[in-house]
């Protein structure tokens, strides 16, 4: 089973069209969206924010989609996801012999974005979810990457990932951590123990990931 992973769309409809065409050309029917749907001009307006999310989901209506919110998405994005039957936020979805565990939002930013969560809340929510996983293997689908990896460094080399997510990864060792959020680290991977960390990168710049679940779990990051 192959799944296209995208994130940080930020209102770029042309990028959605491109990835749809790519998916069709590869015969891939599934998407995981790791948040940040709206453009930078509209994310602070609740109505515009939610409409942009609906627009993207309508554009991908012929695919099987799962989604979490990013920090630029309004908290009511979860209501939209439920309306479209795509919600992965604070959910566990079993695929074959593994579980997909989703948590959206990010740690606080300097920009006052609508979906920001404190470190303690992130840790508690993820711990509770993971302790309910019944399969031997699981994947974390997050917006925020863990702290101090190749996947969370800004252009200045400052690491801005979540300390709590790193602690969760160290404690529970998921097979794979999907993330985005830090655009400058898009397309990079790293490891924490045996866990592979991947920053999918911003779809607004045509970056995607292809998750391949076929016994082994593999992630291929690319620009289309």
Predicted regions, residues:
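Active-site-proximal beta-strand elements of phosphoester/diester hydrolases
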Residues: 1-10, 97-106, 139-143, 196-201, ...
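Active-site neighborhood of phospho(di)ester-bond hydrolases with catalytic His/Asp-centered motifs
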Residues: 5-7, 31-36, 64-71, 87-89, ...
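Active-site environment of divalent metal-dependent phosphoester hydrolases
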Residues: 10-14, 38-41, 69-78, 108-111, ...
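Core catalytic region of metal-dependent phosphoesterases/phosphodiesterases
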Residues: 13-95
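Conserved catalytic scaffold of divalent metal-dependent phosphoesterases
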Residues: 24, 42, 72-161, 223
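Short, conserved loop/helix-junction motifs that constitute active-site signature segments
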Residues: 26, 57-62, 133, 169-172, ...
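Cap/insert and terminal regions of metallo-dependent hydrolase folds
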Residues: 33, 38-56, 145-147, 151-182, ...
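Binuclear metal-dependent phosphoesterase catalytic core
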Residues: 93-97, 117-118, 166-172, 185-224
């Amino acid at each position: 089973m192959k799944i296209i992973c995208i994130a940080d769309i930020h209102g770029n409809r042309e990028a959605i069209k491109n990835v749809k065409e790519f998916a069709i050309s590869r015969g891939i029917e599934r998407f995981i969206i790791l948040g940040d749907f709206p453009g930078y001009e509209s994310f602070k307006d609740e109505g515009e924010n939610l409409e942009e999310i609906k627009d993207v989901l309508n554009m991908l209506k012929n695919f099987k989609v799962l989604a979490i919110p990013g920090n630029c998405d309004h908290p009511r994005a979860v209501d939209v996801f439920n309306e479209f039957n795509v919600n992965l936020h604070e959910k566990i979805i079993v695929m074959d012999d593994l579980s997909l565990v989703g948590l959206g939002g990010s740690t606080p930013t300097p920009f006052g974005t609508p979906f920001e969560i404190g470190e303690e809340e992130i840790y508690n929510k993820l711990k509770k979810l993971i302790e309910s996983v019944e399969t031997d293997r699981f994947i974390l689908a997050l917006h925020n990457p863990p702290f101090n990896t190749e996947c969370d460094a800004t252009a200045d080399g400052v690491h801005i990932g979540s300390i709590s997510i790193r602690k969760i990864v160290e404690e529970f060792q998921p097979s794979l951590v999907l993330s985005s959020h830090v655009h400058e680290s898009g397309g990079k991977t790293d490891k924490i123990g045996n866990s592979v960390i991947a920053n999918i990168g911003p779809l607004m710049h045509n970056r995607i990931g292809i998750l391949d679940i076929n016994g082994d779990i593999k992630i291929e990051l690319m620009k289309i």
